[in-house]
A protein has these predicted regions:
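P-loop NTPase motor module signature
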Residues: 1-413, 488-492, 566-567, 725, ...
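Second RecA-like catalytic domain
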Residues: 17, 228, 233, 277, ...
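A short, compositionally biased
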Residues: 61, 531-536, 723-727
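Short acidic-hydrophobic surface loop/beta-edge motif
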Residues: 71, 157-160, 534-542, 729-734
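Extended active-site and interfacial segments that coordinate phosphate-rich ligands
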Residues: 96-111, 121, 279-283, 292, ...
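Charge-dense polyanion-binding interfaces
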Residues: 106-107, 230, 237-239, 243, ...
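Short, isolated positions in well-ordered beta-strands
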Residues: 165, 547, 738-740
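Charged, non-catalytic accessory extensions
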Residues: 542, 606-821
């Protein structure tokens, strides 16, 4: 058998049940003690497939065939085929990188491409390469692009036609609903199509809805038919017995309407179904920036999902599929699902790979490499949570976090609980954070305090949301009691009371959201229109961002907050759920940094020791005794960014010297003069800075540096002598005065400006560059107005001067204007 094989066959061909049993027969010959692990993405499918294989083997589930998932397991020492869900497989690989005793791993429904599936495959391909070349990997799907997958993995494809029946496609209520529709609207539209299908065709109905909320609403809308029909919900959190009832074969007498989430798309064959109603919607995992966690959001299905759904109607005979979307919408749908790794939060994946320790994440054999920016964001969070070190290696604390089957944020918060009382509170917080805000975050009736939500969880008795939150909290308490040293002993049915300690919730939230520790500033902002302006308090976060909270919110009485959920609009956020933080807890979480930087606004070098959480400065004090080389390095770095405002580079003398050197470089490239323009001076501050900075630390002091000497310092002594010889700074006039020579890069000649009387007695034009170049004389009137430009004074005196003299005598009669100057 090849090390990696792709198996493709239509839905209902027996991939999920017959193939593992056939492989077990092969193992009995090749490796009698070897085990097979089969990854099944969905809990209900994992349980159902394991039970079906056990039935086909004539055994009870848990003997030779078993299953394992979060909070539920049926296996034994005799189990040879173990069906597991995604998170479980990753945990198995991390805890035992060689998968000792496992001969083969099967990936069922691989087309779903969840992040855990990609993670597990990458780890196993690396394990195959490094430690277990004999480990067999089987990838199964009915709709995957086998050509691409085969090329990516360098393996063969085994295909089977299977048995399928024609399915007619009908359109119903096309595009009445979309991914933005409410749960009630989706349910109402679907219930209408159900009634139509019942009247037009015989057989059981399988109805695909995006989630539990739509299923329950639709079930309520169809309740009037419950006396003559069986209306059966099917979703992941439904009790196992109710799930078995929905997937059991029909009795042949009573028609059934099975209202299902996408869990019935694959692996499960429900006998009696010949009608499928496809809402065209599903719940997909997406990163939720509000909470920093991955959440499910309603989205349009892909074409391969549409094919899978329609195929459910043709498993056992001809069928019909009602699609609640138009052909135009179908044409815009993606061909297949986007791999979750491309858009999901990668924090769990990065922690898993670090805990596994097999290879660097960037070097692993990914089918779809994780986006580098998302990887770096995840590493930054894990570093702030002390889950990994600066080299990306997992810490002991990170190992504990990785062992918990929940998001690292939640794991960090659960592990921060130090007493059973805090553990209960952490479990309640985890339930609230992983679900949607149980209170309307924009309502004026509700503040942002997490304690308001905690109180509601324990006092609101009615409503599916509150029941779901309490159930989730109980699961977290069970999880924490299993892995923690906390002595949690209370009746199963006893509900813990909300915390009386106002600061505890904040400390726990800060463990989950270290980058969202916030400190109030003195700033406020107004939000809203001219009619209703709401005053907002501004907080600065450890991430460096700022966020607003209504000034009327009671939380604004606290200087420090731990922010759980927020939305960003541009560069500023809006706080929705938070808890107050005690000053002592904040002080105990800081790290000391010696910060030396140039404050360009104040024009001063700042040297202070800061107590910080991330980029949030909690306190600071002046820092003394800093070595000069450190100060000089900091100033040199600042000069590269702000140099023109720190130094006197714009002075005429500096500009003229730079022009002079540039002109000499044009005339004599063989001198190899270094660049001396402003950009070159600023970028070379590291070289000249130690000679000129001294003990200066303010802009006013730095502006006293002679920048002409800085420019000259770029040249060697020999180069400077040559420049002085070839391009002098001044020339002497017959009057005894000296005049500057103005050099301009690219000009025809350097210019000397002088009043014409000062040049009386100067027979020839002065020359520079070793006598090779005459300067351009700009002769001025007594009023300093230009009267003549010339590079040939001798000719000027003999010709043009007589005409100029007439005009000057007329305008300046009191001056002496000799005929022969």
């Amino acid at each position: 058998m090849a090390s990696v094989v792709i198996v493709t066959a239509p839905p209902g061909a027996g991939k999920s049940t017959l193939l593992p049993l056939t492989m077990l027969e092969w193992l009995d010959r090749e490796a009698p003690t070897g085990r097979i692990i089969m990854l099944e993405p969905r809990r209900i499918a994992a349980r159902s497939i394991a039970e079906r294989m056990a039935e086909m083997s004539g055994e009870e589930t848990g003997k030779s065939v078993g299953y394992r998932m979060r909070m539920e397991s049926r296996t034994s020492a005799a189990t040879r085929i173990e069906v597991v869900t995604e998170g479980i497989l990753c945990r198995m690989i991390i805890s035992d990188p060689t998968l000792d005793g496992v001969s083969a791993v099967i990936f069922d429904e691989f087309h779903e491409r969840s992040i855990y599936t990609d993670e597990a495959l990458a780890m196993l391909l690396a394990t195959q390469r490094m430690l277990r070349p004999e480990l067999r990997l089987v990838i199964m799907s009915a709709t995957i692009d086998t050509a691409w997958l085969s090329k990516s993995l360098g393996c063969k494809v085994l295909s089977c036609d299977g048995l399928s029946f024609p399915v007619a496609i009908e359109r119903a209520d096309s595009d009445r609903i979309s991914e933005t529709s409410t749960s009630r609207d989706i349910a109402a539209a679907t219930a209408s199509v159900v009634r139509r299908a019942l009247s037009e065709h015989d057989g059981d109905l399988l109805v695909f809805l995006p989630g539990q909320a739509e299923i329950l609403h639709c079930q309520a809308l169809l309740a009037d038919m419950a006396n003559t029909l069986l209306i059966l919900p099917l979703y992941g959190s439904l009790p196992a017995e109710s799930q078995r009832l929905a997937t059991a074969p029909s009795d042949g007498h009573t028609r059934r309407i099975i209202l299902s989430t996408p869990i019935a798309e694959t692996s499960l064959t429900i006998e009696g179904v010949s009608i499928v109603i496809d809402s065209g919607l599903c719940r997909a995992v997406a990163y939720d920036a509000r909470s920093g966690l991955s959440r499910l959001q309603t989205s349009r299905i892909s074409l391969d999902m549409a094919t899978q759904r329609a195929g459910r109607a043709g498993r056992l005979g001809p069928g019909v599929c009602y699609r609640m979307y138009s052909k135009a919408t179908e044409a815009r749908m993606h061909p297949c699902r986007t791999p979750e790794i491309e858009h999901a939060d990668l924090t769990p994946l990065v922690l898993d790979i670090a805990a596994w320790g097999g290879e660097r994440l960037e070097e692993m054999p990914w089918l779809t490499p994780p986006p580098p920016q998302s990887v770096e964001r995840a590493r930054g969070l894990l570093l702030s949570m002390r889950a990994i070190d600066s080299h990306g290696r997992v810490t002991p604390h990170g190992q504990k976090m990785s062992a918990l089957p929940c998001h690292p944020r939640i794991a960090g918060m659960l592990l921060a609980a130090t007493t059973s009382h805090e553990a209960d509170l952490a479990a309640d917080l985890a339930a609230i954070l992983e679900d949607r805000d149980p209170l309307d975050p924009l309502s004026a009736e509700h503040d942002a305090d997490i304690h308001t939500r905690l109180h509601a969880v324990h006092t609101q008795q009615r409503g599916a949301l509150w029941q779901r939150l309490r159930s989730s909290a109980r699961q977290y308490r069970q999880l924490l009691s299993a892995v923690s040293t906390h002595a949690i002993s209370r009746s199963r049915h006893q509900e813990p009371q909300p915390s009386d300690a106002v600061w505890t919730a904040g400390r726990l939230l800060a463990a989950a959201y270290p980058e969202r520790v916030a400190m109030a500033t003195d700033d406020t902002a107004g939000r809203g229109n001219t009619a209703t302006i709401q005053l907002m308090r501004r907080y600065r976060l450890a991430s460096g961002a700022t966020a607003l909270l209504p000034d009327a919110d009671d939380l604004t009485a606290h200087k420090y907050l731990a922010v759980a959920t927020m939305t960003m609009r541009g560069d500023e956020g809006r706080i929705h759920i938070a808890a107050p933080l005690a000053a002592d807890d904040v002080a105990g979480s800081t790290t000391a940094y010696d910060n030396i930087y140039w404050d360009n606004k104040a024009g001063v070098l700042v040297m202070q020791r800061e107590q910080r959480i991330g980029r949030l400065i909690i306190s600071s004090q002046p820092l003394t005794g800093i070595p000069l080389d450190v100060i000089h390095d900091t100033l040199a770095t600042a000069v590269r960014s702000y140099g023109e405002s720190m130094l006197s580079l714009s002075a005429d003398a500096v500009r003229q010297l730079q022009q002079r050197l540039a002109v000499v470089s044009e005339w004599h490239p063989e001198l190899c003069l270094p660049p001396c323009d402003t950009e070159a001076i600023l970028s070379s501050a590291q070289e000249w800075g130690p000679m000129f900075f001294g003990d200066r630390t303010t802009a006013s002091e730095l502006r006293k540096i002679d920048m002409c000497e800085v420019v000259w310092s770029r040249l060697s002594y020999e180069q400077r002598c040559e420049v002085e010889r070839l391009a002098p700074d001044r020339i002497a006039l017959p009057s005894g005065r000296e005049k500057k020579i103005e050099y301009r890069q690219g000009a025809s000649a350097p210019v000397v400006k002088a009043r014409i009387q000062e040049c009386f007695g100067m027979r020839e034009t002065p020359r520079i560059d070793g006598g090779r170049r005459p300067v351009l004389m700009e002769l001025l009137s007594p009023g300093f107005k230009p009267v003549q430009l010339t590079q040939d004074l001798a000719s000027f005196w003999q010709t043009t001067y007589y005409e100029v003299r007439k005009e000057l005598r007329r305008r300046y009669p009191k001056h002496d204007w000799p005929e022969n100057p």
